[in-house]
Amino acid sequence: PGQAPGSEDAEFRKASFVTPRAIIKGSSARLPHLALNEHLTMEVARRSGMPAARTLVSEDGLALVVERFDTDAQGHPVLGVEDFCSLLALRPAEKYDTTWERIAQSLRSYVPAAQRAKQLETLLQIVVLNYVVRNADCHSKNVALIYGDAGDVRLAPVYDVVTTVAYTGFR
């Protein structure tokens, strides 16, 4: 992962609202059509066979609703989720300060041996997806492990994938 130019600027930030069942992301004037961009990019992931968070775009196109994959229909947590920023003991401001190799090494440490090869393959698919859709803003907070029943540790469905090349400063 590498930091996209301008991604930490205040003018690139957008409002987000978390509910028990969804994450609602607002738009930014500097990133036009971001909700539609993310929705379509997530559809590419889903249609390629990758587990991906489900998304919907508001009628006015200004908001994206991301269905949470860690809660049940009533909004109760059913899965533990931990992103690689946390797993690598990085502060949120350091989310770009790692490599895919370090993420893979961390994955090997947390995922049981029986699931490891499949999860490393999934990690490779995530890397390829972000390359193919030209997402220059993939970082360690956008890749996570989910914890289900005892011994069930796997990569979370992909989320927060955007074709950033559509925006000046993210090329």
Residue ranges of model-derived segments:
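Conserved ATP-binding subdomain of kinase catalytic cores across diverse folds
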Residues: P1-D97
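Conserved kinase catalytic-core segment
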Residues: R30-R46, T99-Y167
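Short beta-alpha connecting loops at secondary-structure transitions
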Residues: G169-R171
